[in-house]
């Protein structure tokens, strides 16, 4: 099952991980999208957007109209959600304008600690 991990890490930590992978020449086995704070992660991944990601999981490239149909929502609302997810780098747009979320599963990782 192709999984993407959404996590919270500082930009510095993300760059250190990138440098480690670059030097080793070995990419991680799973994709990872990092956010700078838990607040930013949850601002991007609202309940409606998570539902949309579920509808897009494993579907391949689809039009926004098809994404709306799969999610059971209106096209205008889904268009706004798609714009936010594209801006955050969570989903991609194909050359022909369709959208794609190429994963079957999403793992969310973050730690809340006392300051």
Predicted regions and their residues:
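A short acidic, leucine-rich amphipathic alpha-helix
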Residues: 64-71
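Short, cationic-aromatic polyanion-contact patches
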Residues: 42-46, 63, 95-115
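Short, locally clustered residues in the helix-turn-helix/winged-helix DNA-binding domain
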Residues: 54-58
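General nucleic-acid-binding
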Residues: 1-21
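Basic amphipathic alpha-helical segments that dock to polyanions
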Residues: 67, 78, 82-86
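Short alpha-helical segments that sit at the start of domains
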Residues: 23-51
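A short, conserved structural fragment
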Residues: 87-96
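The DNA-contacting recognition helix of HTH DNA-binding domains
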Residues: 74-75
């Amino acid at each position: 099952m192709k999984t993407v991990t959404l996590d919270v890490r500082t930009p510095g930590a993300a760059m250190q991980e990138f440098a480690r992978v670059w030097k080793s020449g070995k990419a991680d086995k799973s994709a990872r999208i990092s956010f700078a704070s838990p607040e930013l992660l949850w601002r991007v991944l609202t309940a409606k957007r998570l539902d949309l990601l579920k509808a897009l999981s494993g579907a391949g490239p689809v039009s926004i109209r098809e994404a709306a149909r799969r999610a059971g929502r209106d096209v205008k609302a889904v268009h706004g959600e798609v714009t936010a997810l594209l801006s955050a780098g969570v989903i991609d747009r194909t050359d022909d304008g369709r959208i794609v979320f190429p994963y079957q599963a999403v793992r969310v990782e973050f730690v809340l600690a006392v300051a």
